[in-house]
C-alpha cells in the first residue's frame, strides 16, 4: 500500500521523547500505520541521545553489536547538523515522501483515532491549503485547550483558550493561532518558516497567519 501520511519530528537530545511518541503511534494507531511513514530529524546526532535514537531506529542489537532489521518499519532517521534551532522541524516537510505531512514534537501523544481522522480529512480534501491543528488535552484527560488567543500573557504572545461549543460539535473549526507542538498540511502547500529563523519559539501566530495569507485558514 502506498504511504499517505508522513509523521515527522525534530529532536535535540530527547531520546525518551522520540521513543515514547513513536511507540505510542505504533501501538495506539496500528490500524493506519501501513499508510504512514515516520521520520526523525536529529539536530544533535553525535550526542549520547542522538546515538540512542539511531540505535532505536536502526535496530541495534546489543548482543551482537550489529544494526539489524530496524525497530521502526518504514521509518527514516535523518541527521541534520547544518545549524541548531527549533525551526529544524520545518525540514520534516522537505524530507517527507508522501502527499500529506504531520509534524509533531517528540513528546506528544495522540488520542486513539486521531491519525485515522486526519487521513480521512485529507482523503476528502486532498488539495486543502489549510493548516490543521488540534486541541491540547490537560493532564487530567478531561479538559482541553482548543486554541491560543492572540494576546500577550506573561511575556509571551498567545493565551490559551477553550471553545466549548465548537469542541463538543466535533467538526473542524477555524482558530486564530495555536501552539506548534502539532501541525499538519498538504506537503506541496507548506508555506515554510523564514530560513533566517534560529533559536526557540516565535512560530505561533506567525505560521498560522502565513497560511492565511496564502489562501488557507
Feature map (PLM): residue ranges:
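Short, acidic, metal-binding catalytic loop of nucleotide-sugar glycosyltransferases
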Residues: 23-35
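A conserved acidic beta->alpha catalytic loop
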Residues: 40-53
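Short aromatic/hydrophobic "clamp" motif used to bind/position activated sugar donors
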Residues: 101
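Glycine-rich, basic loop-to-helix element that forms the pyrophosphate-binding segment
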Residues: 80-96
